Amino acid sequence: MSDKNKKVSAFAAYRGSATSKNDVQKGTKNSDKNGAAKNNNNRNLASKNGGKQKGPPKKNGSYSDGDNGSSSSSGEDEEDDSTDSSDEYESSESGEEYTLNSHSSQSSPETPANTRESLKRRNDEAEGSNPIGAKRTSSTPVGQSTSAARSTQQPKAPSCPLQRRSCPLPSKKNTVPVKVEVASPDRALLSPQSIKKEPGASMLCRIKIGLVKSVQPGGDAGAEAGAGQAVNRLEPCHKVHKENSIEVGKRTLAQLIAPMTMATFLRDHWEKSPFRVKTTTSGGFSNLISFKMIDQMLIQNHVEYTTNIDVTSYEDGVRKTLNPDGRALPPSVWAHYQRGCSIRILNPSSYLVQLRQLCVKLQEFFHCLVGANVYLTPPESQGFAPHYDDIEAFVLQVEGKKRWRIYAPTKELPRESSGNLSQTELGDPIMDIVLKPGDLLYFPRGWIHQAITEKDSHSLHITLSAYQQQSYANLMEKLMPLVVKESVEQTLKLRKGLPLDIFQNLGVANAEWKGAHRQKLIQHIQNLAQRLVPTEGQIDRALDQLAIKFQHEALPPTIAPQELKRTVFGAQATADRNGHCSLDYELAEGTAVRLLRANIVRLTVDEGVLRCYYYTDNGLEYCKYEPNFFELEPFHGTVIETLIHAYPEYTKIKDLPPMGNDEDRLEFVEALWERGILMVEKPFKKL
């Protein structure tokens, strides 16, 4: 392999047209539409100058811990890695996970990323809803607040405001690290507790309504598998770098709904009926959000009304949004709360790392964006009208109590959320329950719901939302245009002109006429439609279009300490007194690599062009940037396809498909690693 400081990575070497054999240019989906790819989306795979980044990492959005020096080896070292569980990364925050591409630039309401309209938001969005399109806005430090008038005494909550670490990737702007709550992968998202299942409540309805109760240790074991056992803490495996991210997401969901098993949930409740997990212990979700965390979030970040926070009320059957203009600072927010208004935080995962970690884990299992909204409601208040949503909702009660009434759907599995409904439209509730701290409530899309706090308690809850626009209908919307387009090329009858008298026989004005000629035309069109049968390849390409949507919407991955020392995000660069830069890593033919996450990339073919989409570079806002992708030659695609099928196992570079020569293959794999797409099995030793 050539000199490390002189070698240029394969992806970085070709920055012009994608027509040459080795061209692997990174582009944007809408470059033709915009005339040229946006500058901030043309981030090269190796560095902005086409080669490796030389020089020490900057502090403006780059990883800057000078003590992180545990890196670099050829990867061929056969050292036993069983000590990883106790192997600190020479950092005082060894349990901290790092979030990629925070892009901490202050948001402006006038920019497209901050406009009120969103693919998934409506003015009549209501409390159980977490429109997945809610903007995920980046954060900017604004210093300490000298005063924060509060209407209620804040409960104590864990607070460890550390500087956020962002990784050495090209940033949109020079930014300053932001103080946020830092999550430890060794801290449980759920409190340990023993659990059992109660029999379902008797309902005058043949729909299965679940009631699952967790009890103190020593309680009776229920019929549900796993009852009487302690809920597993959401702790990482000792071999975090060897785990399958889909299985991690599945395990996380299983712990949320325990003691109900995943099999029971998917068979009896998923997209079918609601259920509640009732706990007898409090504090199950208290490390995800609290009054104190909200207060610190408002102080430390530029959070705006309408973009990031809504102030709402519901009185006398009328729902109102009472948002002021501008930034939402603590005195203003708490004053609204004291007057009886509900506070909805639209993108808390942009600011709260532990909540973001939960969403990131679940999105791998659901293969779609998992959003989060936070709702804070004062005593004896209701912030939203009855309504139904177009998402699968998981309500996590954090503080206080809230009464929920759930009504049977008027339309099963709707594709869009409802407007505000009146009380006269509801009928009798199927469920009428009070959620307490640690309780969880699930209800499918289409189930009407409303919630109100009781006289003696406020409420703080999180709504996780998933599976928005993930139906067969969405797949068919992508598929049928492909079928029509390709069928036209193969079927002469589809290319023939319409009859000259078709306007006089078809259309709404002619619907009552049942003449023979009209019926003949209708029959002919129906026969043509029956020829439009999708091929296997068309179905694959349509599904890839849905997968591109996920790549665009997904939250960037959070990086555990064990992963940090195996990825580019923990790499260090040093320079001597003469300014000569050296890196602390080097890949070799014997280095074993794998994808960072199961769904981190998606290979697609569009108009004969092979592309690889990835979400490592996504921002924390919803669709802040154009989709990230680079274009490939077939032999590049074969390498990525091999890595996809090998996941979660590691593959040595020398065992990947050949690519011209070994040097080309090594440079290509190294370019993927430098983009944050790959992880090595063994931590690098110092060179």
UniProtKB/Swiss-Prot annotation:
Residue ranges with Polar residues bias: 100-116, 136-156
Main location: nucleus
The UniProt record lists the keyword Transcription: yes
InterPro entries membership: JmjC_dom, NO66-like, RIOX1/NO66-like_C_WH
Keywords of the record: Chromatin regulator, Dioxygenase, Iron, Metal-binding, Nucleus, Oxidoreductase, Repressor, Transcription, Transcription regulation
Cofactor: Fe(2+)
Stored PANTHER family: MINA53 MYC INDUCED NUCLEAR ANTIGEN, RIBOSOMAL OXYGENASE 1
Protein name: Bifunctional lysine-specific demethylase and histidyl-hydroxylase NO66
Protein source organism: Drosophila persimilis (Fruit fly)
Organism ancestry: Eukaryota, Metazoa, Ecdysozoa, Arthropoda, Hexapoda
